[in-house]
């Protein structure tokens, strides 16, 4: 059945409206991405300085091994996973890649469905696990596009506290790391115990630069939980940046696809119009011939 010219015109108008919406959403996501990238860069400066300070305190000037439990691996009976997703869709494969990876981890390390807890930041992840019979221990929804530490302080602090109280024995953060506008990289990073402070990066002369007013262990008791919390917060900022990039790319793709559909419909409309005109001319000529 042939499609009428009016139907094609209606489809073109509808697709143009959709294109305008996705283009506007793309520009909004681009603005969000710029702010997120700046926040991520600023955090990296802070994180590097805190990491260097901790490394110097732990390993500099011939310091011996610390007995702080946040630095010591223990027998693993239960694992905690912080899974960071978005609250909604329209972000391409941003959520599916991380959720697929987490389920693969579960099948590999927890095939009996025991020995792990999920802490979900983002509604898509929480809903995904609930639909599969996995009840998140905690969940957080409705983060802003540039989440402040105050927004996530409660869930982060509670998670670190649970590790300290041995409710689980290791903690991983599963999220998408922002590489560039078109690329993100799925990461599963161990946050606790803290094992990635490289002794080779320590300053052997750090004690000449500053003097500790109290014992090293007392300082570490205060500093290590804060460091762990800040690293988790950094992963959240990074994931938000990747989310905004994914949203921008998805809307750009949608806009480009809409333009292609409009072009195809326009060609279809012109052909149908040409056929209609040809048909009218043929009928006029036939009518004139009949009158002769």
Swiss-Prot record:
Keyword set, alphabetical order: ATP synthesis, Cell membrane, CF(1), Hydrogen ion transport, Ion transport, Membrane, Transport
Topology within the bilayer: Peripheral membrane protein
Induction: Induced by a decrease in external pH from 7.5 to 5.7.
GO cellular component terms, A-Z: plasma membrane; proton-transporting ATP synthase complex
Keyword field contains Cell membrane: yes
Record's keyword annotation contains Transport: yes
Organism superkingdom: Bacteria
Signal peptide: none
Compartments (UniProt record): Cell membrane
InterPro entries, per database record: ATP_synth_F1_ATPase_gsu (IPR035968), ATP_synth_F1_gsu (IPR000131), ATP_synth_F1_gsu_CS (IPR023632)
One GO term (biological process): proton motive force-driven ATP synthesis
Pfam families on file: ATP-synt
GO molecular-function terms, A-Z: ATP binding; proton-transporting ATP synthase activity, rotational mechanism
Function: Produces ATP from ADP in the presence of a proton gradient across the membrane. The gamma chain is believed to be important in regulating ATPase activity and the flow of protons through the CF(0) complex.
Subunit structure: F-type ATPases have 2 components, CF(1) - the catalytic core - and CF(0) - the membrane proton channel. CF(1) has five subunits: alpha(3), beta(3), gamma(1), delta(1), epsilon(1). CF(0) has three main subunits: a, b and c.
Family of the protein in this entry: Belongs to the ATPase gamma chain family.
Designated name of the protein: ATP synthase gamma chain
Source organism of this protein record: Streptococcus pneumoniae (strain ATCC BAA-255 / R6)
């Amino acid at each position: 059945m042939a499609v009428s010219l009016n139907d094609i015109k209606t489809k073109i108008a509808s697709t143009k409206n959709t294109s305008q919406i996705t283009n506007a959403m793309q520009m909004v996501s681009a603005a969000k991405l710029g702010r997120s990238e700046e926040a991520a860069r600023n955090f990296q400066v802070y994180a590097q300085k805190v990491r260097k300070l901790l490394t110097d305190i732990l390993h500099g000037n011939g310091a011996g091994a610390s007995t702080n439990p946040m630095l010591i691996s223990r027998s693993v009976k239960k694992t905690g996973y912080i899974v960071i997703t978005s609250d909604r869709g329209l972000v391409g494969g941003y959520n599916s890649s991380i959720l697929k990876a987490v389920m693969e981890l579960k099948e590999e390390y927890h095939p009996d469905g025991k020995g792990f807890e999920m802490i979900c930041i983002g509604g898509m992840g929480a809903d995904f696990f609930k639909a599969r019979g996995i009840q998140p221990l905690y969940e957080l929804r409705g983060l802003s596009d540039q989440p402040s530490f105050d927004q996530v302080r409660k869930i982060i602090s509670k998670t670190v506290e649970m590790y300290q109280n041995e409710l689980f024995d290791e903690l991983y953060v599963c999220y998408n790391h922002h590489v560039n506008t078109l690329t993100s990289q799925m990461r599963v990073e161990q946050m606790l115990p803290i094992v990635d402070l490289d002794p080779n990066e320590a300053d052997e002369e750090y004690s000449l630069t500053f003097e500790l007013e109290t014992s090293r262990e007392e300082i570490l008791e205060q500093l290590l939980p804060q460091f762990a919390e800040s690293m988790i917060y950094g992963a959240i900022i990074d994931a938000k940046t990747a989310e905004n990039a994914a949203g921008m790319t998805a809307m750009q793709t949608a806009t480009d696809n809409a333009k292609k559909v409009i072009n195809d419909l326009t060609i279809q409309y012109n052909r149908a119009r040409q056929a209609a005109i040809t048909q009218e001319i043929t009928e006029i000529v036939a009518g004139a011939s009949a009158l002769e």
